[in-house]
Every structure is written in C-alpha cells, then in structure tokens.
Amino acid sequence: MSMPIASTTLAVNNLTNINGNANFNVQANKQLHHQAVDSPARSSMTATTAANSNSNSSRDDSTIVGLHYKIGKKIGEGSFGVLFEGTNMINGVPVAIKFEPRKTEAPQLRDEYKTYKILNGTPNIPYAYYFGQEGLHNILVIDLLGPSLEDLFDWCGRKFSVKTVVQVAVQMITLIEDLHAHDLIYRDIKPDNFLIGRPGQPDANNIHLIDFGMAKQYRDPKTKQHIPYREKKSLSGTARYMSINTHLGREQSRRDDMEALGHVFFYFLRGHLPWQGLKAPNNKQKYEKIGEKKRSTNVYDLAQGLPVQFGRYLEIVRSLSFEECPDYEGYRKLLLSVLDDLGETADGQYDWMKLNDGRGWDLNINKKPNLHGYGHPNPPNEKSRKHRNKQLQMQQLQMQQLQQQQQQQQYAQKTEADMRNSQYKPKLDPTSYEAYQHQTQQKYLQEQQKRQQQQKLQEQQLQEQQLQQQQQQQQQLRATGQPPSQPQAQTQSQQFGARYQPQQQPSAALRTPEQHPNDDNSSLAASHKGFFQKLGCC
C-alpha cells in the first residue's frame, strides 16, 4: 500500500488481444470520452437497444443500478471495495462499476467522482457517468479500460525496453501536466494507476490515468493562489515511488508528482529499485529506511548502464522549488532525445504488442491482471497484521474462542431438516452481482454478531473488575477493623427505583463479622446480575 490508497483498476474478463497500432499523440482521441456520454438521442442501433431493453419486462432489476447500468461479472476486489464490469443499457457502451461500503471509515468514491467531473473531457481520463447509493454501497460508474502498466510489466518479464519506456514516459508526463492544469496534484504515482485502453479501440495503446482518491488541489481554481508550504505532514502515496520531500514530511506540490514519475521510469528500466525489499520491524521504520536509501543513492548511479537523460530528468525535477511550475515540454524533449540517440522513432510500438507471437496480450493466455489495485497479492492491511500488540491478540483469541463456542452450539441446535435443505441450496456464481450481495449481507451480519460479542465480552470484563474492586475494598475494611460497607444492591435499588427489588438482607448491625464476607459476595453477585439483566445483556 504503500500507504492507505484506494486503487481501482478497470479490466474485463473477455478482453481479446490488441490489434492495430496506438495513436501516440495523446490529443488525437479527445472525442473518445464524449462518445459514451448518456443521451437518449442516439443512432438507430442505440434506439433499437433501448427499445429491446424496455420491451423486456422480465429483466432482473436487481442487477441494474443507476437506472440503466447492467451489472456483469466481478473483475476485481480489494480492501476498499469491489469492481464489476457493466453495460450502459441505453447505448451498449461497456462501463466499470465500483462498489464501496457506505459504512467504510474513509469513503472515497464521492470525492473521486467530483474529481472525475472536473477532469471530464480531458484526453485519456475515464469519463464518470454516475455516482449514487445502492443499498449498502456507494457506486461509481466510469469508462471500462484495459490492464495496467504493472500488469503489462509482469507479462513482459518485468522489464521494458528503452523505447517502450520513453513512449510511456512521454504520455505519463502529459497526463500529469493535464491534471496540474486543472489545479490538482495526484500524490499517488504508481504503475497500477496507469492503464491502456480496450482492444479494438482507437486508444487501445494510449496510457490512461485512473483512481483520484488521493488527488488534492494545490492552488485555488479562481485566484490561482498556491497552497502554503508546510512540514510534519503525514505520508501520502506509495513509498516505493514517492518523492524524497514526501518522506521528509513536507507538503506535496507539482514537483513531487514529477519526481515520483522518475522513480517509475527507473523501475521500468531496471526491473527493480535499490530501495525495494528493505526489512524493518514496522512500516514506519521501513518508510524511513526507504527515504534514507533514496537520499543516499546518486541519480547517475541509478542510471548506470542506461541513457543518461533519465538521470538528468530525475536530477532536474528534484531541484524544483515548492511552487515552481515544471517544464513539461522540456522533459518530453529530453526523453525523446533518447530515441534519436538510438536511431528509433516514437511509432506507437510497445513491448506488450509482441506478446503471444505478435498477437498482443490476451487474458485467456496471460494471467489475470491486477485490476486497478484490486486483488493485489499484498494489500496494505495484510502487512499491518504482523505488528499487532499482544493485548489485541489476546482479545482476538478470546473472541475466536467465543465464536467457536457459539458455532458449536448453533451446529448442535441445527435439525436434520435444516441440514438437508442446506444441501439443496443453489450455488451462486462467485463473480455474479447476486453472489456479491449475498456476501455483503453475510459480512454485515458477521460484523453485527462480532460487535455483540465484543460488547458481551467487555461487560463480562467490567463485571469481573467490579467484583475484584469490591473484594479488595472488603479486605481493606476487614484489615482495618471497620465494618464493611452496605451491599451494592441497595445503591442500585435506589438508582433503578421500584422496578428493582433485590432480596432483603439483614442489617449489618445484626450480622456477625463471620457473616459479612459471604453475605456481601452473594449480594454483590445478585446485584450485578440484576443490573445487567436490566440492560438486556444477560
């Protein structure tokens, strides 16, 4: 994770291999994002599709969201939500539908939708069609794209040619320039968030930018006033690629996006960065080690055996001041000069187009891609589990034991008829929306049961603590020779009024000292039991 990030990657399971060359000019396909805008006034094909969908009265409305978006198969899942392929039923355009639990601690889809609306119409940025709430989830509908650069990097043997890196780098710089032109900085540059288009489309090999959950305004859109410089900021982004200033806790600006791009370029060229694989007891110390390694690594040592222009690029962007505007065109010319030195041209030919004997990538042959960060083999929350304290582990162990006891009781109470009925329940396709709904309902039920169990465990612990405190008080009173205090039941009786009627006890004056310990303990236990019964938890 890297840091907490909500990556979303869009892909489709039935994508075929890429045909045709890419248009390297990132401005040439500006109208692509407008072809899919919702509009009832479409071609005759669109009208026919709409008529057919309206005439089908038996359609399954449970798989339709946002009025006319049909949910298909699940194509990705991660700690922040689930991704489905879908179809616009009005015009037949394929879309990606992102689901996010509404009760999540840090919802991001609404803010991401606002960012997409700001960027709508920008070349090679997915178009956002809809945001809304469906049951227990927020949903976001955007353009469906192809695999990420990280996926393609894997398929190509975890190393790109210099020519491919140059062409990819030029497009990535242009994407970030367009983002900066809209007064936004990205703050989470990584290969997972740069995708190519769908096969058969004019932009099939164009690089697209997705997932704006970490994006932030660096200046006021009206006054163009830049945000102030600050320090002691928390880390935002992916540690492998973030800038040195970000490691130092400094406010991010345009320069940090450009430096992170440079780290990605070297990642593609080398296949590995010097600060990868560092070990540390926890994430905080690991990020510190990564930052120290970045500072101690000379850019030209990093570029050893590679075109010197890449080292020069990283040196330039690291020297930018906080508010300085990057020279995007100068960076593109610098990197394109690498192709001149090699006698190559930016002809839109990429390494992934040579896969499978020149047929291009194919999901039926290549492994399933890392779908916009969903389904990542090492999600951030998995790493943090290794560093939990002993107290939390003990609580979890107690919870597990309590759950096992309840499961055993439920299993024992299950009748033979229930067992027979469960065997004949139809199995759902795990990639279907119905399966996801069922899974979500089960998850919320489990969370509710877990909260109830935690509450019960806390009440039991509280009761034990109160008993221990009462016993300690009684022991102290007996040690000093003072008579024990009145039973707790009398105080609680006064608190709860006439509804609470504890068993009457003889007065302390009529009891012998030998009677006090037993009487006090029994009355305390009874009083606490009655107290929790009134709360409805025993």
Swiss-Prot record:
Glycoprotein among keywords: no
Keywords: ATP-binding, Cell membrane, Kinase, Lipoprotein, Membrane, Mitochondrion, Nucleotide-binding, Palmitate, Phosphoprotein, Serine/threonine-protein kinase, Transferase
Cited InterPro entries: CK1_Ser-Thr_kinase, Kinase-like_dom_sf, Prot_kinase_dom, Protein_kinase_ATP_BS, Ser/Thr_kinase_AS
Membrane recorded as keyword: yes
Stored PROSITE patterns: PROTEIN_KINASE_ATP, PROTEIN_KINASE_DOM, PROTEIN_KINASE_ST
Binding-site positions, ATP: I75, G76, E77, G78, S79, F80, G81, V82, L83, K98
One Gene Ontology biological process: signal transduction
Region Disordered, residue ranges: 39-61, 366-428, 474-527
Bilayer disposition of the protein: Lipid-anchor
PTM annotation, UniProt: Palmitoylated by AKR1.
Subcellular location(s) of the protein: Cell membrane; Mitochondrion membrane
Main function: Casein kinases are operationally defined by their preferential utilization of acidic proteins such as caseins as substrates.
PANTHER family: CASEIN KINASE-RELATED
Other facts noted in the record for this chain: Present with 1630 molecules/cell in log phase SD medium.
Family: Belongs to the protein kinase superfamily. CK1 Ser/Thr protein kinase family. Casein kinase I subfamily.
Protein name according to UniProt: Casein kinase I homolog 1
Organism placement in taxonomy: Eukaryota, Fungi, Dikarya, Ascomycota, Saccharomycotina
Record gene name: YCK1
